[in-house]
Each structure stands twice: as structure tokens, then as C-alpha cells.
């Protein structure tokens, strides 16, 4: 079965949304890795920030790279240290970013596992990750 046209671009995104992560879906992965600090809807849980200000980052190449680096290597912020999640699979990290993209109703293309893979192996420290 070959897909052409718009369906060819939409299919990877749809597959990521339905991707079983640890057998329970991306919502379970979000709850386990992100929601404890950033909230179920990315609204923030004191003292940790909401993620609404990240929405514009999804629309630029520099912003998208920054989001991937934060998930892989962590980030040092005013509220403390966010851990990196490099132990997760590329598909899982892409699914988390796509979940955030949907939560924020941000503009931008869905992330693919390849977007994560190309940033692995840099061994960056959290304080080296700078917002563009």
C-alpha cells in the first residue's frame, strides 16, 4: 500500500500519536517524565515553569534543535536542574515533543525519530543548553 500526497506527510505524525510507549501511550510517558514538574497540560507545577513560552520554538530550526537538546541533555534553570532523558528511545522523545506540540497548539512540523538521532552523542552538560 503506497501513500502519496498529503497522507504521506501526515502518516508519520499519526503513527507517533498512536505509538505505544511502555504499553500505555504517550500520555503515560508524559506523566512519568514531564507532568510531575510541568503539569498534565504543560501549565507548570510550582516551582517549575509552564511550557507555554516554548510554543514559538517549534516553528524555527534553531528552536526545534534546542527542544531536542533539552530533552536529551537536560537544562539548568531558575527552578533547578531538569534532567535529560537520553535513555529514552528516539521514537519516545519524538512522541513527547509531538505531544507538547499538540498541548501548546504550536505551529511547526511534527518531530521524527531522525530529528532526535542526529543530536545524540554530543555529551552536553545541562548548563551548555542555551535558548536561541
Which residues are covered by each model-predicted region?
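Ligand/cofactor pocket segment of small-molecule handling proteins
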Residues: 24-50
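The canonical Cys-X-X-Cys-His
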Residues: 30-40, 71, 82, 96-99
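Electrostatic cytochrome c docking/interface patches
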Residues: 16-29, 45, 59, 130-131
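Gly/Gly-Pro-rich "capping" loops immediately C-terminal to redox-active cysteine motifs
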Residues: 43-75, 79-87
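Positively charged n-region of N-terminal signal peptides that target proteins for export
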Residues: 2-10
Amino acid at each position: 500500500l503506497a501513500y502519496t500526497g498529503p497522507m504521506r506527510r501526515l502518516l508519520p505524525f499519526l503513527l507517533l500519536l498512536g505509538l505505544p510507549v511502555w504499553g500505555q501511550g504517550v500520555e503515560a510517558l508524559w506523566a512519568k517524565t514531564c507532568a510531575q514538574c510541568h503539569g498534565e497540560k504543560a501549565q507548570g507545577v510550582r516551582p517549575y515553569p509552564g511550557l507555554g513560552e516554548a510554543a514559538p520554538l517549534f516553528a524555527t530550526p534553531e528552536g526545534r534543535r534546542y527542544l531536542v537538546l533539552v530533552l536529551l541533555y537536560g537544562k539548568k534553570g531558575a527552578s533547578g536542574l531538569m534532567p535529560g532523558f537520553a535513555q529514552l528511545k528516539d521514537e519516545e522523545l519524538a512522541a513527547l515533543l509531538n505531544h507538547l506540540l499538540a498541548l501548546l497548539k504550536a505551529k511547526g512540523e511534527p518531530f521524527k525519530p531522525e530529528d532526535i538521532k542526529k543530536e545524540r552523542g554530543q555529551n552536553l552538560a545541562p548548563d551548555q543548553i542555551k535558548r536561541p
